[in-house]
């Protein structure tokens, strides 16, 4: 009994203790909740003077660093899928400019209001590593089927999304983003922004103090959220409380947010405006890097070289005096504390030494006494444009004078770098300049702003010609007439804008190597050259993690082509298509020496016969014969291309009538060349293209017999079947012969490559069998295709020679002019085993060719119809 009483008392005691514990817990919880609320309210009501370096003042609890799921880069190709509003929308163009400047691959499509999105996978691999929406509303308003399809792809292939929201006059003051725990407040005027230093996406961007001042425009969107997946990247304030009554002007708001993927497994970065604000560009580049798993990323290393052209050149009052030279030296030392190995690179024209005022001549002397402090490179002696010199010897004389001046004054002559006045002769290439440079100076490197064109600057590239490395050169807004700060074109604010996040800043941001062109006059008077680069370097170091350094020109060139080896080969263009190019191209040259059409092959299909038939027309003129390749120039497909367009155009006569005369060339190797279509489209983009197709099996056999007749060792050692059926173990000469027999017969593959660069209306496909049996009809079709006049009557001009077995030109007196003895040879018929092998080998290629011809609206040749019947 006592035991039961004791148990009851213990139970009551336990109940009392539990109740007491619960009450204490409630009190403690209430205290901390109230304290947390007060702390949060304190964090939200932040003053405008807050600095981002003090993390305690940041207004979002989500600014605490969270673990982000790593991006799996193995499942996708490194390509961006870009949805734009239209082909010409400004934001879309700005996005493309950054992608192209960064050399990131992208595929642009118009964002569908309704309908399907493009295919996202290919053979089980994702085609895109990142999706960008110019208008994020197009993404959130997609129909459920396509949105689910896209988001499933993003989750499965570890793909992220970047989106922009640009408010307009129709935007509601506030709204919730459909499908997201995210509120948008639109059309706001903002000021004083800073970068969240704890944002995980920061790579290039540094988070310094607040960027004071109003943000451009009054159409900003800010984001508010109540989910741990969101983290602010860029924060700012309202300019005034009147912007929106429900928001406090003392609160910090996010204009760029990062979605860590905790909500639905997809990481995103959203921008509350376009890319007009320079910080948005910087963060956009970092967002691409982070969300692509660093596959689409820019290195932090930046090489800059500042050239000062026209040393000793310039009229009185625009040159450097002693104080200017001392300032140049002092600034160089200052910049060396921020840019490793920084050295100004001085380009001189010795003829103009001591042609200024007395003070300016003293400046010349101080420059020469300080010669070892700088790097030096030769301009032309008299600052003449090299393309005006029509022979190499005259250029050599000018260069020798400048070299003698350099030797007399102790200027180093072994830097291996030169710049031509106005970049004349560098591109378009003036071969005499390259030859003279090598002969007198041993030049290894030059630079130009003209390749392939001056604008847009992001397309500038390098190339190598005649063993001289040509680097892209950048402008910086300083020209010979840019002398005074207050008189800067558009006002001094334009120069400052370029430095502080504008064009000049972006040049360094987006180019791993930048050679800047400045002039002597930029370092006198207001010394805008010094002002520009001191402020530019300070700004870059304040806002980025970029590592700035300088290399001598030759080392810089080697570094450039290590980064961009694909640029070594030039891509020649028609100088007459760019006014700037034509202005710095010799007047002795003419673009009339370029062909209007090309006969591209393939070999052993009847191209020589077509060539001779074309020459019968009074208005059609071919190239002059080559001593090595006879009637074929073979320019676009091989090493001849590196000899330049002057070499190529020398093969063509001057037409008597540039309108009615048609220059052409026939090179049968062009057809299957990987380089020829792109090169031809660059130099002669309006040219028409003619190709001839016969049964690829017959073509392969004919090539084999052709090689036997030319005593090719492999063709003599192996029979035809052994050649076409050999495996990977075969000796190199046999594999080479096999490729030359088989690969040109991949007709659809090669034609598609040409159609990548030329319109279908520029391509004529001739049935080789019809050309052999009925050439007059084919030539009528060719004339119509070319638009050549007058129409030539081939029916009366051609006659069949039964002895030769093909058609010949009928001359006066009944004589004929036929193909040479090497053409139309009689070979033993192909063995059945080889015929069967080739029929199987080309089956898929022939099917693809039939599809291509159907798409082009062209009839199928008889041989192709016969081969397709075998497929069934």
From Swiss-Prot:
Gene Ontology terms: cellular component: Golgi apparatus; Golgi membrane
Membrane topology category: Single-pass type II membrane protein
Residue ranges, Lumenal side: 35-872
Covalent S-S links between cysteines: 808-818
Binding site for 3'-phosphoadenylyl sulfate: 604-608, 702, 823-827
Annotated keywords: Disulfide bond, Glycoprotein, Golgi apparatus, Hydrolase, Membrane, Multifunctional enzyme, Signal-anchor, Transferase, Transmembrane, Transmembrane helix
UniProt-listed Gene3D superfamilies: P-loop containing nucleotide triphosphate hydrolases
Record topology, Cytoplasmic segments: 1-13
Residues that carry a glycan: 226, 341, 391, 657, 793
A GO molecular-function annotation: deacetylase activity
Pfam short name (any one): HSNSD-CE
Entry superkingdom: Eukaryota
PANTHER family documented for this protein: BIFUNCTIONAL HEPARAN SULFATE N-DEACETYLASE_N-SULFOTRANSFERASE 4, HEPARAN SULFATE SULFOTRANSFERASE
Function: Essential bifunctional enzyme that catalyzes both the N-deacetylation and the N-sulfation of glucosamine (GlcNAc) of the glycosaminoglycan in heparan sulfate. Modifies the GlcNAc-GlcA disaccharide repeating sugar backbone to make N-sulfated heparosan, a prerequisite substrate for later modifications in heparin biosynthesis. Has low deacetylase activity but high sulfotransferase activity.
Miscellaneous note of the record: The presence of 4 different heparan sulfate N-deacetylase/N-sulfotransferase enzymes in mammals, as well as differences in their enzyme activity suggest that some initiate heparan sulfate modification/sulfation reactions, whereas other later on fill in or extend already modified heparan sulfate sequences.
Subunit-level organization: Monomer.
Name recorded for this polypeptide: Bifunctional heparan sulfate N-deacetylase/N-sulfotransferase 4
């Amino acid at each position: 009994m006592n035991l039961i009483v004791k148990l009851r008392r213990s139970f009551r005691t336990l109940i009392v203790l539990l109740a007491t514990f619960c009450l204490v817990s409630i009190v403690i919880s209430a205290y901390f909740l109230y304290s947390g609320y007060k702390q949060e309210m304190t964090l939200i009501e932040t003053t405008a003077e807050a600095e981002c370096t003090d993390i305690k003042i940041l207004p979002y609890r989500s600014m605490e660093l969270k673990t982000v799921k790593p991006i799996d880069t193995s499942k996708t190709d490194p390509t961006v899928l870009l949805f734009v509003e239209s082909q010409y929308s400004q934001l879309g163009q700005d996005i493309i400019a950054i992608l192209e400047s960064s050399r990131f691959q992208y595929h642009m499509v118009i964002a569908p209001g309704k309908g399907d999105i493009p295919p996202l996978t290919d053979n089980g691999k994702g085609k895109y590593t990142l999706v960008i929406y110019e208008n994020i509303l197009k993404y959130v308003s997609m129909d459920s089927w396509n949105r689910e399809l896209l988001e499933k792809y993003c989750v499965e292939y570890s793909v992220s999304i970047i989106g922009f929201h640009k408010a307009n006059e129709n935007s509601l003051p506030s709204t919730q983003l459909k499908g997201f725990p995210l509120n948008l407040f639109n059309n706001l005027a903002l000021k004083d922004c800073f970068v969240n230093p704890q944002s995980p996406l920061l790579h290039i961007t540094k988070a310094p103090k607040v960027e004071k001042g109003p943000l451009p425009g009054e159409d900003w969107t800010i984001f508010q959220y109540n989910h741990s997946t969101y983290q602010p990247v860029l924060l700012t304030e309202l300019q005034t409380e009147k912007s929106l009554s429900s928001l406090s002007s003392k609160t910090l708001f996010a204009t760029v947010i990062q979605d860590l993927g905790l909500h639905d497994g997809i990481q995103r970065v959203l921008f509350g405006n376009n890319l007009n604000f320079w910080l948005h560009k910087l963060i956009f580049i970092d967002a691409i890097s982070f969300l692509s798993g660093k596959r689409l990323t820019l290195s932090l290393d930046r090489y800059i070289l500042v050239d000062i052209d026209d040393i000793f050149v310039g009229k009185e009052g625009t040159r450097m005096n002693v104080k200017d030279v001392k300032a140049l030296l002092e600034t160089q030392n200052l910049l060396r504390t921020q840019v490793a190995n920084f050295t100004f690179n001085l380009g001189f024209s010795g003829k103009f030494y001591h042609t200024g005022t007395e003070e300016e001549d003293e400046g010349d002397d101080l420059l020469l006494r300080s010669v070892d402090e700088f790097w030096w490179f030769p301009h032309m002696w008299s600052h003449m444009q090299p393309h005006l010199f029509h022979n190499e010897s005259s250029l050599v004389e000018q260069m020798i004078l400048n070299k003698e001046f350099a030797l007399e004054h102790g200027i180093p002559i072994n830097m291996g770098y030169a710049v031509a006045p106005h970049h004349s002769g560098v591109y378009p290439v003036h071969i005499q300049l390259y030859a003279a440079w090598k002969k007198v100076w041993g030049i290894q490197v030059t630079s130009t702003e003209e390749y392939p064109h001056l604008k847009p600057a992001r397309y500038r590239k390098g190339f190598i010609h005649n063993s001289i490395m040509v680097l892209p050169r950048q402008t910086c807004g300083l020209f010979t007439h840019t002398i005074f700060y207050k008189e800067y074109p558009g006002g001094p604010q334009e120069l400052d804008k370029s430095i502080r996040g504008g064009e000049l800043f972006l040049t360094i941001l987006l180019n791993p190597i930048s050679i800047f062109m400045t002039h002597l006059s930029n370092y006198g008077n207001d010394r805008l050259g010094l002002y520009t680069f001191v402020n530019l370097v300070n700004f870059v170091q304040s806002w980025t993690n970029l590592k700035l350094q300088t290399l001598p020109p030759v080392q810089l060139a080697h570094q450039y082509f290590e980064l961009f080896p694909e640029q070594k080969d030039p891509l020649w263009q028609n100088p007459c298509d760019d006014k700037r190019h034509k202005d710095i191209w010799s007047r002795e040259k003419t673009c009339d020496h370029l062909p209007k059409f090309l006969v591209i092959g393939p070999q052993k299909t009847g191209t020589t016969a077509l060539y001779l038939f074309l020459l019968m027309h009074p208005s059609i003129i071919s190239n002059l014969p080559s001593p090595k390749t006879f009637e074929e120039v073979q320019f676009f497909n091989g090493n001849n291309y590196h000899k330049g367009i002057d070499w190529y155009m020398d093969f063509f006569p001057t037409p008597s009538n540039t309108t009615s005369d048609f220059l052409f060339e026939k090179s049968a190797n062009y057809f299957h060349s990987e380089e020829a279509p792109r090169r031809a489209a660059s130099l002669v983009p309006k040219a028409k293209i003619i190709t001839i197709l016969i049964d690829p099996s017959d073509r392969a056999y004919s090539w084999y017999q052709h090689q036997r007749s030319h005593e090719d060792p492999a063709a003599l050692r192996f029979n035809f079947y052994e050649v076409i059926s050999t495996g990977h173990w075969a000796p190199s000469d046999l594999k080479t012969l096999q490729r030359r027999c088989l690969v040109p017969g991949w007709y659809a593959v090669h034609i598609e490559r040409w159609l990548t660069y030329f319109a279908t209306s520029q391509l004529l496909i001739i049935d080789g069998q019809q050309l052999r049996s009925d050439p007059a009809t084919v030539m009528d079709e060719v004339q119509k295709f070319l638009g050549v006049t007058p129409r030539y009557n081939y029916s009366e001009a051609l006659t069949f020679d039964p002895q030769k077995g093909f058609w010949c030109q009928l001359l006066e007196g009944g004589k004929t002019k036929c193909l040479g003895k090497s053409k139309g040879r009689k070979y033993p018929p192909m063995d059945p085993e080889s015929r069967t092998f080739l029929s199987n080998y080309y089956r898929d290629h022939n099917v693809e060719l039939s599809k291509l011809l159907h798409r082009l609206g062209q009839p199928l040749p008889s041989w192709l119809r016969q081969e397709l019947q075998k497929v069934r």
